[in-house]
Amino acid sequence: MVDVSETTERCVVHKRQGQDGGDAAWRGVQKKLRDFYGSAIYDSWLSALVYSGNENGRVVLLVPTRFIKEWILVHYLERILKYWQDESDAVYSVDICVSDGVGVQPQMAEHPDGAVDGPPVVMVGGTYDHLSSPLDPRFTFDNFVVGKPNELAFAAARRVAESSAPIPGSNPLFLYGGVGLGKTHLMHAIAWYILNSSVKRKIAYLSAEKFMYQYVTALRSKDIMLFKEQFRSVDILMVDDVQFISGKDSTQEEFFHTFNALIDQNKQLVISADRSPSDLDGVEDRIKSRLGWGLVADINETTFELRLGILQLKIEKMGVHVPNEVLEFLAKNIKSNIRELEGALNKVVAHSSLVGRSVTIESASGILSDLLRANHRMVTVGMIQKKVAEFFGIKLEDMYSARRLRALARPRQVAMYLAKRLTQKSLPDIGKSFGGRDHATVIHAVKQIEKFMEDDAKLADDINLLIRMLR
């Protein structure tokens, strides 16, 4: 593990005295970095590095801004050090230092060969312009594990990436699902695929919050026309977590007009959120309607098999050995989201490396005790009744009443279905919690909801959202 912390003193840049023999080694490191990461990532981030010198085994590399430095420290420093040590046994550390005099900016990465028609306003893979957010090099299609919960979203994202123009019925592509299930991964994967393809397209990828920030900044600086021109000149606009424009009236107005302008120009939009378009509370109906124009693909909760596959791919990429029974233990017990699952694996592997002992189920249980408790939070029938009543806008006492109005009966059946699915209560006990109903009523409710979910996508979305909220 590389220590990315550094003192001010360590980052003082000393003027090179003559040749230290490091130039040839640095060229070797640069070649290995380009070969490993590819031209797109290298040109976006690593081409900014300038070799300063080797001071008794401490290599100093310069970058023009602190942002570039911090990004390289987090994402690339370990491999840079490894390649330096491959080139020279005497190197023990690499420091990244900011120097205003470097004067090196990475290439605009609209296309791997740098050939761009007209002035580039959007860059994929970096934030040296003021539109796009950085892309994570780990988030590619090759690193995405496909299973039943995400196969539609994956296929749709891949199809958009491979097509040179918007596909009828898939514009916009709207991806939705809970936190940490892979929406952002797929959006980054689309961008990386296009970036490395032979088709020249300008892409803007950013969060809804950053879109709002850019819009407000443009208003304050009276650059609103430039803002409009830049966002409406892209070939693909990707906006992550669009639910965050909820309640922001002026931002929604601008997003609406940007959306329309791009659709009118036959440009592709990819949008993500934590819920379906119709469930985006606080978002204008006209926007929700447009978000549902194209293909709406949900990413459901992961299955055991999918979680296990993700862990197996992860350890393969890490180059470490973890017994399969430990992977199965993690896949069985950490169900919240992929982010937590991968974080748990990282924690277990790091602990094993530090203490020098193999990973076992017992050691993993101890290391992850807090996380395991959180993932086994007890869901009660009372919690379900309260949440369902709030969700459907009925009174809590309607859960127990004998009234059979459809507006009350359907939420009550949903609550029974969730109680059967999320608790360990017996059917008779569940029935008693709903005003003394018998187990046959609960069975009927469960079967009804299962049948309705097959035919009613909106109800299925609502129930999946309730499950995420309860867990």
Swiss-Prot record:
Assigned GO CC terms: cytoplasm; plasma membrane
Location in or out of the cell: Cytoplasm
Record-level GO BP terms: DNA replication initiation; regulation of DNA replication
Region annotation (Domain IV, binds dsDNA) ranges: 353-471
Region of interest: Domain I, interacts with DnaA modulators: 1-91
A GO molecular-function descriptor: ATP binding
PROSITE patterns assigned: DNAA
SMART domains: AAA, Bac_DnaA_C
Binding-site residues, ATP: G180, G182, K183, T184
Protein keywords: ATP-binding, Cytoplasm, DNA replication, DNA-binding, Lipid-binding, Nucleotide-binding
Positions of the UniProt region annotated as Domain II: 91-133
TM regions (residue ranges): none
Coiled-coil features, chain-numbered ranges: none
Stretches for region Domain III, AAA+ region: 134-352
PANTHER family referenced in this protein's UniProt entry, alphabetically: CHROMOSOMAL REPLICATION INITIATOR PROTEIN DNAA
Quaternary assembly: Oligomerizes as a right-handed, spiral filament on DNA at oriC.
Family (UniProt): Belongs to the DnaA family.
Function comment: Plays an essential role in the initiation and regulation of chromosomal replication. ATP-DnaA binds to the origin of replication (oriC) to initiate formation of the DNA replication initiation complex once per cell cycle. Binds the DnaA box (a 9 base pair repeat at the origin) and separates the double-stranded (ds)DNA. Forms a right-handed helical filament on oriC DNA; dsDNA binds to the exterior of the filament while single-stranded (ss)DNA is stabiized in the filament's interior.
Free-text comment on this protein's domains from its UniProt entry: Domain I is involved in oligomerization and binding regulators, domain II is flexibile and of varying length in different bacteria, domain III forms the AAA+ region, while domain IV binds dsDNA.
Protein name: Chromosomal replication initiator protein DnaA
UniProt source species: Anaplasma marginale (strain St. Maries)
